[in-house]
């Protein structure tokens, strides 16, 4: 890139393979010290040199308007983000200002140039992209946080989602959403019931309708594999639901009570993790 006769270094670029790809999926990387996040990201990249792109599942930083945290986040992925693309999600922490009040996610929207979604009002909040035989749909689950600034985010996004899915001809349809569709009981808080979150009740019927294959979520800083769910119950014909874990050093040991739909739970206490998503050439 050249600007005012000054240029960046040269970077390699490759196009997707028609059949195979590999992606790294990082859960919430928010931290009070981004050292752990840097170690995890760099180790993941070193162990997976063939990765084509990486995903960060929202709450990239602890405070969305603290530019020191953004500097630390980008420093952690130096050498990675300049050779493979990133698909970021907005989390609720991207909507906080330095007084911990909810505001527009100004920094997040300026840090990343994301595919257009046809909306001027909600530009950058949700989007989709293709990679090889897969269609990825990135949702904005911050409807509560946006309510003071925008009306109709959920309705606009759901209309866009239906049209976006209708137009794709890709074999695999994968949803990425920050807030988790399941609701967990919290230890020592009996008033909170197990079930489905507002996001789950709003989106899971649409995932069933659209024939989504996999749903990745985050927000709870824990890893859970729920298997396939349809019509709010276990069903092999529904999407596979994966709660991705934690990639930063903000951890909630012993907070969540296991859900009846959990099939696999990470060993406790949990440490940092990432996921690898493979599609072979077959």
Name what the model sees in each region.
Residues 61, 168-189:
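Short acidic, glycine-rich surface-loop motifs adjacent to enzyme active sites
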Residues 2-9, 68-169, 189-197, 202, ...:
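Extended active-site neighborhood of metal-dependent phosphoesterases/phosphodiesterases
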Residues 31, 62, 143, 181, ...:
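Short, glycine/acidic-enriched loop or turn micro-motifs at the edges of active sites
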Residues 1-25, 30, 42, 47, ...:
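Acidic, histidine-bearing metal-coordination/catalytic regions of metal-dependent phosphoesterases
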Residues 44-50, 164-171:
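Glycine-rich phosphate-binding loop signature in dinucleotide/nucleotide-binding domains
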Residues 21-22, 52, 126, 133-134, ...:
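Alpha/beta-hydrolase fold active-site loops
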Residues 21-95:
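Conserved, compact domain cores that house catalytic/ligand-binding motifs in diverse enzymes
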Residues 25-27, 53-59, 85-92, 140, ...:
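Active-site neighborhood of phospho(di)ester-bond hydrolases with catalytic His/Asp-centered motifs
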């Amino acid at each position: 890139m050249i600007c005012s006769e000054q240029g960046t270094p040269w970077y390699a670029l490759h196009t997707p393979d028609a059949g195979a790809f590999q992606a790294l999926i990082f859960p919430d990387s928010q931290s009070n010290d981004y050292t752990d996040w840097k170690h995890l990201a760099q180790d993941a990249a070193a162990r997976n040199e063939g990765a084509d792109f990486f995903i960060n599942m929202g709450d990239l930083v602890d405070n969305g308007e603290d530019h020191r945290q953004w500097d630390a986040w980008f420093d952690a992925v130096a050498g990675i983000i300049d050779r493979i693309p990133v698909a970021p999600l907005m989390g609720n922490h991207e909507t906080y200002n330095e007084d911990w009040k909810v505001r527009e996610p100004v920094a997040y929207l300026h840090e990343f140039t994301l595919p257009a979604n046809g909306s001027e009002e909600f530009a950058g909040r949700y989007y989709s992209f293709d990679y090889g035989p897969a269609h990825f749909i990135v949702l904005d689950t911050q409807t509560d946080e946006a309510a003071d600034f925008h009306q109709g985010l959920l309705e606009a996004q759901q209309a866009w989602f239906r049209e976006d899915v209708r137009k794709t001809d890709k074999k695999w349809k994968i949803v990425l959403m920050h807030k988790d569709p399941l609701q967990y009981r919290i230890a020592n808080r009996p008033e909170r019931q197990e079930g489905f979150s507002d996001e789950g009740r709003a989106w899971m019927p649409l995932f069933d309708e659209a024939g989504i294959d996999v749903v990745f979520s985050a927000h709870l800083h824990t890893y859970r594999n729920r298997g396939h769910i349809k019509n709010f119950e276990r069903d092999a014909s529904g999407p596979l639901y994966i709660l991705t874990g934690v990639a930063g050093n903000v951890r909630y040991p012993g907070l969540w009570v296991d859900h009846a739909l959990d099939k696999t739970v990470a060993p406790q206490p949990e440490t940092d993790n990432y996921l690898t998503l493979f599609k072979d050439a077959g």
